[in-house]
Curated annotation (Swiss-Prot):
All residue ranges annotated as the ABC transporter domain in the record: 2-243, 317-545
Top-rank lineage group of the source organism: Bacteria
Membrane-spanning ranges: none
Ranges for region Disordered: 271-317
Keywords from the UniProt entry: ATP-binding, Cell membrane, Membrane, Nucleotide-binding, Repeat, Translocase, Transport
Comp. bias regions, Pro residues: 278-293
GO cellular component: plasma membrane
EC number(s) on file: 7.-.-.-
Source species: Streptomyces coelicolor (strain ATCC BAA-471 / A3(2) / M145)
Name of protein: Putative ABC transporter ATP-binding protein SCO2324
Signal sequence extent: none
Principal cellular location given in the protein's record: membrane
Entries under Pfam families matching the protein: ABC_tran
Localisation per UniProt entry: Cell membrane
Length: 563
């Protein structure tokens, strides 16, 4: 169904091909996983299937890509639209209508399908992806994960023969990700749909793959094979495979079920051994930054008096009885949360639970409808942005919101100036997080993971006492996640408070002191990470599921205990 024949792609201005010697075939009715570190060209390979590369992106494609017998060099994307449905890393770039139901119908309207067929397929897709309650909602009011489900649904309704998905579960909570992957598996098995998918969170998808195409490094030829065979030599692999490598299991397990069947000897070796703690207790607070200049004029006009911004507080962040309403949606209600200096807190919960709204309240982007919010000694929504930036930094779900320069070098230089940091500080952070990003590249030409890493570096340059991160591992491979965790752990040890909203249960297990679970805008659990995640089948990391009932969370803990 999809055939790559010795394909190389070189973008305009590049001296070397982004991908080279790509040669593989995806048979009809198979799900093939495209894996590899960040920046190796996975999105380029996916883009070539639908003709976006090179017709839209520019550059030179050598070799041949055919889809259902159509050569993508001679067929433009619109001439492949009846065969190929594509969902990229950025769902927002797909939307052309305002509401969920209209978006699901748009692709079918473009293909001229009869109204009765369109109505039936919209209803089917709403049910399949759990979108029925959102059918009339404006897309702009949805959470990132809800938008991702709508984007996937919009390419399912036309019933294409080929689905091309670039990190389709990156913004989904664990339960929603399982639902989407189950739908894809049903399409593959029952309808013969062909799926080519790139995904960094291999722990979610590896068990569904018929084959894996591994891009080991930029410009290197891919390795193709059965999932277990490729994972045995892959530089990127899920925790269950890492545990199997450590224990010497062969063949390597790809599922929790298979790993548990073979874990009894490992449990016996670990019996009585202390579980290492990789999240030391919070440290002493940082010195207080200069007092902010509050924005008070509009409050005085209303006869209100602003709260004293200099009132002492032992917390880096303090939320009391917080309620936030966004349009017609009650996003948060009765939320109480405190974060101490040096503490790392993971906000978790279903898509639309209110995690991003809570971060927005902490950085002053939304105003409480009830209750109070403090970031250190500042009231965020009443503090001038130039003062607030030195107290709290936010890396949003869409990193492009922070990037405006024409090159990586200019972006880093601006970050150094804005933070009064030594020249080269941002660049050094970027190189530590993700080596190999050149100074002269435009931020828009980076992969999603590379863009996120650049935005992280820009915010971390100011070293704010309170650091907020919204889905910080979206688009990052395991090595980049490990480097990010190391940097965040170092910041916490210096007294920085960190609050991250994430669906990445492995990151929460590795990094967080506490996990706060949100549901429908309310806090339903708040406690030590090991207690909260292990108690939940949805949020327990892979190692915890394999080695239960003891609270082992990461492969690193097991490795340290065995040495």
């Amino acid at each position: 169904m999809i055939r790559f024949e010795d394909v190389s792609v070189t973008y305009d201005g590049a001296t070397e091909p982004t991908v080279r010697a790509v040669d593989f075939e995806v048979p009809e009715g198979e799900l093939v996983l495209l894996a590899g570190p960040s920046g190796v060209g996975k999105s380029t390979v996916l883009g070539a299937v639908g003709g976006l590369v090179p017709h839209f992106t520019g550059g030179t494609l050598r070799g041949r890509v055919t889809v259902a017998g159509r050569d993508t060099r001679t067929h433009k994307p619109r001439e492949l639209a009846d065969v190929v449905g594509t969902v990229g890393q950025d769902p927002l770039s797909h939307f052309v209508t305002d509401t969920v139901e209209d978006e699901l119908a748009y692709g079918m309207e473009s293909l001229g399908l009869p109204p009765d067929v369109m109505r039936r397929r919209v209803e089917e897709t709403l049910d399949l992806l759990g979108l029925s309650d959102l059918r009339s909602r404006p897309i702009a009011t949805l959470s990132g994960g809800q938008q991702q489900r709508v984007a996937i649904g919009s390419v399912l309704t036309p019933h294409p023969d080929v689905l091309v998905l670039d990190e389709p579960t990156s913004a989904l909570d664990p339960a929603a990700a399982e639902e989407v992957l189950a739908v894809l598996q049903r399409l593959v098995h029952d309808l013969g749909t062909t799926v080519l998918m790139a995904e960094h969170r291999l722990e979610r998808v590896i068990q569904y793959a018929d084959q894996v195409v591994l891009l080991p490094a930029p410009g290197e030829a891919p390795l193709i094979g059965a999932p277990a065979e490729v994972m045995a030599v892959s530089p990127v692999y899920p925790p269950v495979v890492g545990l199997g490598r450590l224990a010497g299991w062969s063949p390597l397990p790809l599922t929790i079920r298979n790993a548990r069947r073979r874990a009894a000897p490992l449990r016996e070796r670990l019996a009585g051994r202390e579980i290492p703690d990789h999240t030391p207790p919070p440290s002493a607070p940082l010195p207080a930054p200069p007092a902010p200049r509050p924005v008070t004029s509009r409050w005085r006009r209303r006869g209100k008096r602003p709260e004293n911004p200099s009132a002492p507080t032992p917390y880096a962040a303090e939320v009391r009885s917080l309620a936030v309403r966004r349009d017609r949606v009650q996003a948060l209600r009765h939320v109480d949360l405190t974060v101490s200096p040096g503490e790392t807190v993971a906000l978790m919960g279903r898509n639309g639970a209110g995690k991003s709204t809570l971060l927005s309240a902490l950085v002053g982007l939304v105003e409480p409808s009830a209750g109070s919010v403090r970031a250190g000694d500042a009231v965020p929504h009443r503090t001038a942005p130039r003062d607030l930036v030195r107290r709290v930094g936010l890396v949003p779900q869409e990193p492009r919101d922070l990037l405006y320069a024409d090159t990586v070098a200019a972006e880093c230089a601006a970050a150094d100036r804005d933070a009064d940091a030594a020249p080269g500080t941002c660049r050094a952070l970027l190189s530590e997080l993700l080596p190999g990003i050149t100074d002269d590249i435009h931020p828009r030409d980076l992969s999603e993971g590379q863009r996120l890493t650049l935005a992280l570096s820009v915010v971390l340059t100011a070293r704010p006492p309170l650091l907020l991160l919204d889905e910080p591992t979206r688009g990052l491979d395991y090595a980049a996640k490990a480097r990010l965790a190391g940097i965040l752990r170092g910041l916490a040890a210096e007294g920085h408070a960190i609050v991250l909203a994430t669906h990445d249960v492995e990151l929460a297990a590795e990094l967080a002191h506490r996990v706060v679970l949100l549901a429908e805008g309310e806090v339903i659990a708040d406690g030590p990470a090991a207690d909260v995640v292990v108690a939940s089948p949805s949020y327990a990391p892979q190692v915890a599921k394999v080695l239960a009932p003891r609270k082992w969370l990461t492969v690193a803990q097991v490795r340290e205990a065995l040495t």
